[in-house]
Every structure is written in C-alpha cells, then in structure tokens.
Amino acid sequence: KEQKTIDSLSYKTIHINPKAVVDEVNLFTEKLSKNGYLSSKVIQERKANDSTFVFEFSLGQKIDFIQINTQKASFLRENKLVEKDTITIAFSETESFMNQLLHQLEVRGFSTSGVKLTNFSTDKNILKADLTENITAARHLDDIVVLGYELFPKGHKKQLKKRYRKKVFNKQILSELYDDVQKFVFVNQIKAPEILFTKDSTKVFLYLEKSKANNFDGFVGFSTDENDKMVFMGYADLVLNNLLNSGEQFKLYWKSDGQEQQTFDFMTELPYLFETPFALRGNLNIFKQDSTFQNTRTNIELGYYFNYNTRAYLGYSSMESNDIQNTNSLSLNDFENKFYTLSLEYFYPNRTDFLFPEKIRANIKSGTGNRVSNFDNNRQFFVSTEAFNNFYLNQKNIIHLKFQGYYLESDSYIISELYRFGGINSIRGFTENSLQANLFSGIMAEYRYVLAQTLYVHSITDFGYFQDQASGFNNRLLGLGFGLGLYTNGGLFNLVYANGSTDGQEIKLSNSIVHISFKASF
C-alpha cells in the first residue's frame, strides 16, 4: 500500500549529479508532508551501483484533517475573518486557508502582519493546532517618490499623490497606481514599483524614464497651378507630448493637394493647471476649398480630469466662413457661428502592444449656438461622436470596431458649414474630406491578424450613411479593402488599399485609393 502511494506521487529518476539526487529526495519528502504524511522519513538509503541510489521511505500515519483552534486569534475573530472556535478542514487545504487569511489581512492594510499554527498534536488521522497571530499597525500609503525622471511633471505627480495618499495600502492599490502611471504616454516604467516599509510610514518608489512619445508623419512636394505658379503640396502630422516636461500636448496638422483643398489645424492642451485637476485646451482650424470658400474656426475649452484618461470639457467655439467668389446664394455665403460646447472623453491605452497602443477611445461633443449669415439668423445644435474598441479574440486575432457620427440641426444649411469626411481616418476608399453632410453615421470594421510581433494584416469593411440637406442629397457608402501595419525602430508604417462606392454604384477598381502613412516616433 505504501509503495502504491509513493508511486502515485511524481518524482524524477534521472539526475546530473549526487546533489540533484539529494534535492529530489528533500522535494519528495515535502510532497509527502503536503499530502498528509507528516511522520514520513527515509529509513534506508543505499548505493546500488556507481550511478544508482535507492531510498526507502516509511510513510507512517496519514493525516486527513486538521482541527484549528482559533481562540487565541482575537483580532481575526473581532474582524470576522474567522467566526468559529474550532475549524476543521481537509489537511490538503491548510496552506490555502492560511494564505486566504494573509490575503484578507493584506487587503485591510495589515501587509506586515502574520498568522501561524502552533501547539501541534495528533489524534489518529486528525492534526490539531492553535491559530496565532502577529498583528502590526495598518499600513497607509504616505508618499510616492519618483526616481529616474527628475523633471516628471509636478501637476501629474501631485494628482497621483492626492488620489493615493492615506489610502489603505495593499497590492490592489499598488496595481492601480502602476496602471495609472501606464496611462502617461510620455513616460516608461523601468521596473515595477517598490515599497519601503518603515516603522511609521509606507512609501512607494516609481522608477520612470522619459519615453519617445512624439510622432511625425508627412511629406512636402511642389507642383504648378493653372497659371504656372509654384504651389506646395503634401501633408504634415506632428504630435508633441511633454516637450516642456509639464505633460502638455501640441498637435499640428497641415495638408494641401496643391489644387482643391488646404487644411491647417493646431491644437494645444495644458493639463493640471497650477497642479489642479483642471486643464486648458485651444484649437485653430483653417480649411480652404479651392476658390469657393475658406473657414476659420477657433475653440477654447476648460477641462476637468476625473482621472487622466477620463475628462470633461466646457468650451466656446466660433467660426468665420468667407465666400471667396462672392456667390452670395442661400447655399453659399459669408457667415459666422458661435457655440457653447460640452465634451466627454475616455481612452484606455495598451502600452504593451506596439502595433495597437490604444485599446479603447470614446469622444462625444455637443454644442448649442447660432449662425448669422447674409440671409438669416439660425439657432443651431450639433453633436459629434467617435468611439473604437479592439476586441482581442486571442493574441493573434483581433476585431477592431469604430463608430463615427455627426448631426447638425438647423432651419437651413450652408455648404461651407457642413461636416466633411472621407479618407483614411473615416470611410476609406474615398478622397480625404471629399464628402459633406449635416448628418453622418459610419461603422468601420477590421479583422486584424498578427503575423509577428511587429507585423499585422487586416481587412476593411466600412459602412456609412449621410444626408446633405444643403444640396438635397443623401446616400449610403461602402468601403472595402485590405491593409497592413509594420512596426519598426523608426515608427509605425501603414498601407491601406480600399475601394469606395455609393448605393447603386457598381464597384470599380478604378475607384480604389491607396493610403500610405509612416508615423515616426522620437
């Protein structure tokens, strides 16, 4: 019977040296103890030949249950961690039971406290023991110290301390702190946070370094217009994060096709103003449509950070539109509008995934105001939204779903105030900003397959619907295609081939568009 029990427990029979043999015997003895054979021992060991060792064990009485007396564990009893005077459990569950008690103490802030079993005795197959405790003072997080990046933004550090200081300290709090720091795209955590327990304080040390959080994508070319004048063409997309070590962000976007459209957009955001949860964001956007019209929009917003990735903004927006050709018609004329806006934003980064650094993003913005044109004065309301999520079926198969929507309510519409869309960041297969609408909704779907840690391919299936009441036109949109993404030391390269068509229009290869981008990180 004892031999059958021994054979049921796995052990290695081949070893590289005598020391490994002794280690295996000790490990096997420990296995016997965990299975209830506390009095097991080696009663004979012999060397059969130069390479064979034989050990004979006596198992003794097996312990099936443990009976734990809790009367000496007053703190555990007072806090309802144990409620009975005597607890009887299977002996194999002893380690799990003790670990659960330690976990419950740790969750309550008693990280340096301990429990143990003493005064052992046996009664046939039952082991009896007393549960004793060593309870130290509850731990609270007293300070957060940043090492490695001495110029870490003061506002961000203060808000971290404000959120976590004096909280009951446990592993969950440490994990939440780590996750919150991961949301700062401008820093890397060199290693996991470390804890320093002193007699009267608990400190957490963060080991940080400034990351390459800036991106640039673009090219510049030259061409001639119909009058043989040289014009610039190309685009530039620049994002600067934490350039001044205050956590600020600057975005600059410029695009010109040399003929029909020119776009200039500049945005800056200053977070944690005066080390408070408030932020300031400003934006200037200039859009010119050939020789038809030019729009100049300015936005100023005061933001509040509930936490770093959840924000709300109150803002004021104004736009001036010039009818360049002085058409002065109901559908195209000079106007000005002003809106008071409310925005909500949420994002969840995925810093460990180089190919898809953001898992979730959701933005919604609404505004109410009025438009004054050469013909009328209209009250207006708008709402715009964009949201996406990466659904990980597993590490290699990912479904990316994105929704975009826009609605402008007005008694009348002017062409130059309509929402413009189409292109790589919207319905793919259409020229950038070639579509316009007062109502638009679109769903963009991708099936992504990761070929390697730095390479993936994906399908493209985009659906959209829009209404253009200024032109009395509405239609459905379809974009189909495929693409790939490649992460290099320099940045992320994307190639997209997409074909766009409208409802009732035959899909033609001649309508296909290739989108290429390379975001360099520095």
Stretches with model-predicted labels:
Residues 237, 252, 265-267, 360-522:
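C-terminal transmembrane beta-barrel domains of outer membrane proteins
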Residues 36, 60, 109, 136, ...:
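Glycine-centered flexibility sites
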Residues 10-224, 235-237, 251-258, 265-267, ...:
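Periplasmic polypeptide-binding modules associated with outer-membrane biogenesis and secretion
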Residues 149, 354-356, 455:
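A generic short alpha-helical patch detector that favors 3-5-residue windows
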Residues 1-11:
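Short N-terminal segments immediately surrounding and downstream of signal-peptide cleavage
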Residues 170-363, 391-393, 420-424, 433-437, ...:
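Gram-negative/organellar outer-membrane beta-barrel architecture
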